[in-house]
Amino acid sequence: MNLAEENTIFKPLYSLKHSSINAYFSKNSDDFVVRERPLYEFSGKGEHLILHINKKDLSTNEALKILSEQSGVKMRDFGYAGLKDKQGSTFQYLSIPKKFESFLSNFSHSKLKILETFTHENKLRIGHLKGNSFFIRLKKVMPSDALKLEQVLMNLDKQGFANYFGYQRFGKFGDNYKEGLEILRGKKMKNIKMKEFLISAFQSDLFNRYLSKRVELSHFANDFSEKELLQIYKISKEEAKELKKQEQFFKLLKGEVLGHYPFGKCFLCEDLSAELERFRARDISAMGLLIGTKAYETGEGLALNLENEIFKDALEFKAKMQGSRRFMWRYLEELKWRYDEEKAHFCIEFFLQKGSYATVVLEEILHKNLPE
């Protein structure tokens, strides 16, 4: 990002080219359901009590406050694998010290239910989940739009999707990355958690901008000639030829950082032909930069040039951030859908690995920005 343009709220490019689809979506507890999938089975023994809860139209923090008030558990003693959105119905797991079990025996709340409990050896930590399954109901869908939805879903199932950070990451007005930048420039903030969150929003915004640049490159590689690619990216004839040869939508680049999919270590793309085979088999994927001192460094070539274009003005703040890598390209799993023509409802279900946003997938499907 050119920091001179930091006041521009960024809208990422879509990977698919269809026109927008008419459908009504409301993120409520009937039409948006999230089910967290644990990373491991709970052991049935230990000093921690795992609560399987269902919350409706409550944020995770609001649910914790309710439980804290009725049980006496301090907020810091709760464990959870991930924060969930306020809107919708969410099934997720929390942990508390087992000694508080008796205080929850008479728990009752209209928007929060404890479905079952387990015992386990350790407290739940951020990231202790495999991912989330989603149910989304679209309304006011006419038959012609239902056909478009089916085609789009088949395309997404085949090619995957750009793993952008969702609008939730950037606050109500979509611009909290600006506050993160101000903190990096020296603005003081006492709330450590909020400070870290705002800085991460700045990192996330840069990640989205770089991923959008890669989506643009992939479109150009499909649509333009080798000669035009030479002029746009100032690359060699061999590099342009390699781009044109790649049949999958998202193009890999020699010298970029890859990772074993869906979990695994980072490494550099040195043998492009070999890595393309593994990418098409969904064994590896490309990793985008969350800028910081601990992030795996890109090697060379066009990947490095494009990265520098986005991140060059943020390098002066690199030492203030730890950084990491995040998958740029991911895949829908367990995808299914059904259309009820009489009700004009189109229901979609899928599973996403942890860290991916269902709303990002829905924006790609509908070609509309959320929330509307």
From Swiss-Prot:
GO biological process: one example: tRNA pseudouridine synthesis
InterPro entries: PsdUridine_synth_cat_dom_sf (IPR020103), PsdUridine_synth_TruD (IPR001656), PsdUridine_synth_TruD_CS (IPR020119), PsdUridine_synth_TruD_insert (IPR011760), TruD_catalytic (IPR042214), TruD_pseudoU_synthase (IPR050170)
Gene Ontology annotations for the cellular component aspect, listed alphabetically: cytosol
Alphabetical keyword list: Isomerase, tRNA processing
Record-linked PROSITE patterns: TRUD, UPF0024
Similarity annotation: Belongs to the pseudouridine synthase TruD family.
Catalytic center residues: D85
Gene3D superfamilies: TruD, catalytic domain
Pfam families registered for this protein in UniProt: TruD
Superkingdom to which the source organism belongs: Bacteria
EC number: 5.4.99.27
Organism: Campylobacter jejuni subsp. doylei (strain ATCC BAA-1458 / RM4099 / 269.97)
Reaction(s) catalysed by this chain's protein: uridine(13) in tRNA = pseudouridine(13) in tRNA
Alphabetized CDD domains for the sequence: PseudoU_synth_EcTruD
Annotated HAMAP family: TruD
Domain TRUD: 160-330
Name used for this protein in its record: tRNA pseudouridine synthase D
PANTHER family the record matches: TRNA PSEUDOURIDINE SYNTHASE D (PTHR47811:SF1)
Protein's job: Responsible for synthesis of pseudouridine from uracil-13 in transfer RNAs.
Molecular function as annotated in GO: RNA binding; tRNA pseudouridine(13) synthase activity
Gene of this entry: truD
